[in-house]
Amino acid sequence: MERLLVLVRHGQSEWNLRNLFTGWRDPDLTERGVAEARAAGRGLKRDGYGFDVAFTSALIRAQRTCALVLEEMGLSEIPILRERALNERDYGDLSGLNKDEARARWGDAQVHAWRRGYDVRPPGGESLKDTAARVLPCYVATILPRVMAGQRVLVAAHGNSLRALVMVLDGLTEAQVPDLQIRTGVPLVYRLNADTTVASKTVLDQDVDAGR
């Protein structure tokens, strides 16, 4: 039985381009973000992947990425389930602030701890640990059962919600989290064993400019 799980972070958003903390704010994709999503779909189709169901967050940048990936694959008709639990980490009072301005105000070390630490909350926001506390139950209760039943599953979400998932799938420690990068529009392809552990992982790098 095939147990396929593919994770993809949304393409570049307007606030990614402007170097702003985004969190639960809802900017759309940039032109490059659209191209990244389409490239991900082309690459997945080229390599012979298909999906039976897709999950995404309540935010437009992830939803559009999901739709564009599936459109490129000719799979726009499959069910797309929106889960608020897959939303990006809530950056609280940092949301909408320029990251360089935040570093100037609070210092590099503090901003790095807020962005990359596991259990450090920005003012009024969530830590990665908090984010994992809503993402992982959603994965276990809603996504994983479909994978284990043999459905091929796509998850289009966000840097931090996917970091929480990858931490578990890859067996990473809290100390390894600061170095974990989830790139925009790059599919992470997992095949799972019968006991839900990871059998294999493939990173599908894409040529964003091809086919534009």
UniProtKB/Swiss-Prot annotation:
PROSITE patterns: PG_MUTASE (PS00175). It comes from the Bacteria. Substrate binds at residues 9-16, 22-23, 61, 88-91, 99, 115-116, 159-160. The keyword Kinase does not apply. InterPro entries: His_Pase_superF_clade-1, His_PPase_superfam, PG/BPGM_mutase_AS, Phosphogly_mut1. Its EC number is 5.4.2.11. The active site is at H10 (tele-phosphohistidine intermediate), E88 (proton donor/acceptor). SUPFAM superfamilies: Phosphoglycerate mutase-like. Homodimer. HAMAP family: PGAM_GpmA (MF_01039). This is 2,3-bisphosphoglycerate-dependent phosphoglycerate mutase. It comes from Methylobacterium radiotolerans (strain ATCC 27329 / DSM 1819 / JCM 2831 / NBRC 15690 / NCIMB 10815 / 0-1). The gene is gpmA.
